[in-house]
């Protein structure tokens, strides 16, 4: 699934030279910032490495940015890889043996590490030692390599898929949450200054309200609306041009797009609001289950349009109202599910 509202990274997102370098520049996640500042100062005062850190939560909220900030704050080199890229234990050993003291090793999608790689990582995280086998067959022998004191930072959108032994080795687990409108406005205002964009307060608010609580999406929308403004001959990005551009991008007033409507209407039209299993939804929409669970559902659940129940997904009365569809005649049991927590 590729669309303007996807919180996943794209190569074009990296073109924006606006990533903050230090905690004081990072907008949002206030409690995380304050706690990180304490942990970093304490580690530096003791002349120790920062404890291994795990960032988890929906995509697009700043996990990679915070990892780079930590590297800058502690004065180490930043080395980055991803769980799927580390196929063999030897791949991990090669990375670890090239680290220096106070380096930060960032592993994105850490929940996708395979078991053999994880087992090598345990002793590296806990004892800063690497146990590897050199040679083959009868000539094989174990070798223990001492590693420098480094900080491992893991990032995941699927916290529940990380094994307990690996999860327990992170001294600093931190959940990143969706941003509110005011925080997203701050992100947009900072970006507009760095990019020399004349963005009005009403313009930043309009983009923020439709950005699904996600900075990555907000910045992507800002860049696309700038395109509409340039072609339309406007030097200032205000609410009017934002509304025009967002409608052209099929982003509605609360940040839903055609993929969200497909999801909601499938459940509404075919299952009278649900419940319906996620595998059925994925098959009907020709989407991967992971894509639905990581890209579409988190925001729909956050704003109260979808609920996950033991029997499957259910869209709420608020969803029917937003779709401007009549609420179906359902059994009292089904209505109880729809009305739950409304």
Swiss-Prot record:
Its EC number is 3.6.4.-. SUPFAM superfamilies: P-loop containing nucleoside triphosphate hydrolases, Winged helix' DNA-binding domain. Pfam families: AAA_lid_4 (PF17864), RuvB_C (PF05491), RuvB_N (PF05496). It is found in: Cytoplasm. InterPro entries: AAA+_ATPase, AAA_lid_4, DNA_helicase_Holl-junc_RuvB, P-loop_NTPase, RuvB-like_N, RuvB_C, WH-like_DNA-bd_sf, WH_DNA-bd_sf. It catalyses: ATP + H2O = ADP + phosphate + H(+). Belongs to the RuvB family. This is Holliday junction branch migration complex subunit RuvB. It comes from Rickettsia prowazekii (strain Madrid E). The gene is ruvB.
């Amino acid at each position: 699934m590729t669309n303007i509202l996807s919180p996943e990274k794209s190569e074009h997102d990296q073109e924006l030279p606006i990533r903050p370098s230090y905690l004081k520049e990072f907008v949002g996640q206030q409690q995380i910032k304050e706690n990180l500042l304490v942990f970093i100062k304490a580690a530096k005062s003791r002349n120790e490495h920062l404890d291994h850190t795990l960032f988890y939560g929906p995509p697009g909220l700043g996990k990679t940015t915070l990892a780079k900030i930590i590297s800058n704050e502690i004065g180490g080199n930043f080395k980055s890889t991803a769980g799927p890229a580390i196929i063999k234990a030897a791949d991990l050993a090669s990375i670890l043996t090239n680290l220096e003291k106070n380096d930060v090793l960032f592993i994105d999608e850490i929940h996708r590490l395979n078991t053999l790689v994880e087992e090598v990582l345990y002793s590296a995280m806990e004892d800063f030692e690497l146990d590897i086998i050199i040679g083959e067959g009868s000539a094989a022998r174990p070798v223990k390599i001492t590693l420098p004191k480094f900080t491992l930072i893991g990032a995941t959108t699927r916290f529940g898929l990380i094994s307990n032994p690996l999860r327990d080795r992170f001294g600093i687990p931190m959940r990143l949450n969706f941003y509110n409108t005011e925080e997203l406005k701050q992100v947009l205002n900072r970006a507009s200054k760095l990019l020399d964009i004349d963005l009005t307060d009403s313009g930043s608010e309009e983009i923020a309200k439709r950005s699904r609580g996600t900075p990555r999406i907000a910045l992507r929308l800002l860049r696309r609306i700038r395109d509409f403004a340039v072609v339309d001959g406007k030097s200032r990005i205000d609410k009017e041009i934002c509304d025009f551009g967002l409608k052209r991008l099929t982003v509605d007033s609360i940040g839903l797009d055609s993929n969200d409507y497909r999801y909601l209407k499938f459940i509404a039209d075919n299952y009278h609001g649900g419940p319906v299993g996620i595998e059925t939804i994925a098959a009907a929409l020709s989407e991967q289950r992971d894509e639905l669970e990581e890209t579409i559902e988190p925001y729909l659940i956050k704003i109260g349009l979808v609920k996950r129940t033991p029997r499957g997904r259910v869209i709420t009365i608020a969803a029917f109202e937003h779709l401007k569809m009549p609420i179906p005649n359902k059994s009292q049991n089904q209505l109880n599910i729809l009305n739950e927590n409304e």
